[in-house]
Amino acid sequence: MQGLLRNVAPKRFYFEDALITTHNHDFVNDPAFRKAYNRGLKASRGKNSHNQWRVYLALWAARVCSKIEGDFIECGVNYGVTSSAVMEHLEWDKLGKQFWLVDSFSGIDERQTTDEERKSGALETNEVSKRDGYYNCDIERVRQNFSQWKSARVVQGWIPECLNQVTASKVAFMHIDLNSAVPEIQAFKHFLPKLSPGAFILLDDYAYVGFDVTFAEWNKVGRELGFEILALPTGQGLIHIR
């Protein structure tokens, strides 16, 4: 398939993170994007690479939300790839906003995994991810990474217990990437009353392969609360607050 596409459109071929397209993706060569993306890679020190379109979507949503009243929140920071890219892209300390960076830095919360997630191997994946360094468990490394910005606030703890440490009165943007349905939805519901009109919530795992439980649970909440989720070909999901 890759060979065929390269023959059909050799100058317009994108294949990364399970996304294949021959449509325009000139953003990958944009200097502003490259600078932001490379800052994200610096945070990961080689982990979590090859996800340019995911980061591109985060940068787009963050740019829109930078003009909206409220702070930014990331639930599920890991190494800080996406949030570092966003902060670099927006010249963060010039915005007058706080970026709240919430994570256990201990993998997923096993107490909150559903029966379906356990059956799909979530606990085993959690242990392997911690062992192999896909999940970052070194909070000091994270603090060092974000020391570049005065308006970055690292919050360590389990969701929802730690969320009272986030003192934002308004929220303009959320990036949720907890790899577990229950705490993702708890975080969303906690901050829902504080979301400003026009805010975006970017869900990292919503439509991603292997996250069927997350997809179903988010759709259920969407029906209950009356909002739509846009499924993106990257596996992400996007919610717009009106």
Task: For each feature predicted by the language model, list its residue ranges.
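N-terminal auxiliary segments of SAM/dcSAM-dependent transferases
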Residues: 1-20
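S-adenosylmethionine/decaboxylated-SAM
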Residues: 23-52, 59, 67-242
